[in-house]
């Protein structure tokens, strides 16, 4: 990330992970808007539907993380921002309350996640412009859909915890 940010003179970026198939472009835009208002180091979306938003990161803060980290395994990099006390952390602002759900899993890690996404995407005429609100509305109307994969959420969270390491110099 740092190499790309430096090469293209980027001051701030929002990540969108490849396994978050329904990452919400509107939420990503909110991350950019918030940075331009506040210039914080790190923006997170605690409590948002899993897979709808990841993080907004300032290049200046990322450079500092790269200087202090003592590991090349940084897949679970957020702890370098949130647990070191070195950075200004903000929660994503101006988000619809509908997007705050802890009972929906929108990330692709297991076979049943694929089945979940397949069901979601085939439920809409235009699956290429879905918002988190659209998905939540569908799942409210058809709650059995979220049961396809939500049982995997605790296993996934534990796996994330097991892979998270904070190693500083």
Residue ranges and their predicted role:
Residues 8, 20-49:
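Conserved donor-nucleotide/metal-binding helix-loop-beta segment in metal-dependent transferases, i.e.
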Residues 10, 52-64, 111-115:
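Conserved nucleotide-sugar donor-binding
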């Amino acid at each position: 990330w740092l190499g790309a940010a430096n090469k293209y003179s980027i001051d701030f970026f929002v990540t969108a992970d490849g396994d978050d198939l329904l990452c919400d472009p509107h939420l990503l835009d909110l991350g950019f808007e918030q940075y331009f208002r506040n210039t914080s180091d790190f923006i997170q979306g605690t409590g948002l539907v899993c897979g709808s938003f990841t993080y907004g990161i300032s290049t200046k803060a990322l450079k500092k993380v790269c200087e202090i980290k003592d590991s090349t395994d940084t897949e679970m990099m957020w702890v370098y921002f949130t647990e070191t006390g070195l950075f200004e952390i903000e929660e994503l602002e101006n988000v619809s309350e509908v997007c705050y759900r802890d009972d929906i899993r929108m990330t692709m890690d297991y076979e049943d996640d694929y089945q979940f996404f397949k069901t979601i995407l085939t439920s809409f005429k235009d699956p290429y412009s879905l918002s988190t609100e659209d998905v939540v509305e569908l799942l409210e109307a058809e709650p059995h859909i979220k049961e396809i994969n939500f049982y995997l959420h605790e296993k996934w969270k534990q796996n994330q915890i097991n892979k998270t390491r904070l190693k500083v110099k």
